[in-house]
């Protein structure tokens, strides 16, 4: 099943549950960290037992950065024998627009995080989707958020990608 209907926090969990229970593979376009965390917490074990693969974040929000970092990490290892320590993705131009579902998803996440400090903490945690958060290193303050700034290495002004914290 491939679904493109957001906000996933509102519409997605029943479909994830149905797929997990039926052993049916599932893919979506979500960038909603709270939805994905809920999906993992509630249905990972069910999906694993049934053989279903639940794959979130298969859209523009995540795929280009995921693939770019994967290729860069492989190259760092192949060329230098070292793991990739840091990556910066710069998008100079893009075409397309933002759907009403995306706007509604953003509104929903902002409202939920504003009302619930625990959810806000999840939304701000770059390891929120880690299967074992306690084993992850503390990297200190993340540079994925903040105001536009001039990047001397790139020689241009840059601003964080709205999905950068999620993709971290």
Region locations from a protein language model:
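Rossmann-like NAD(P)-binding element
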Residues: 1-10
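Active-site-lining helix/loop region of Rossmann-like oxidoreductase modules
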Residues: 74-168
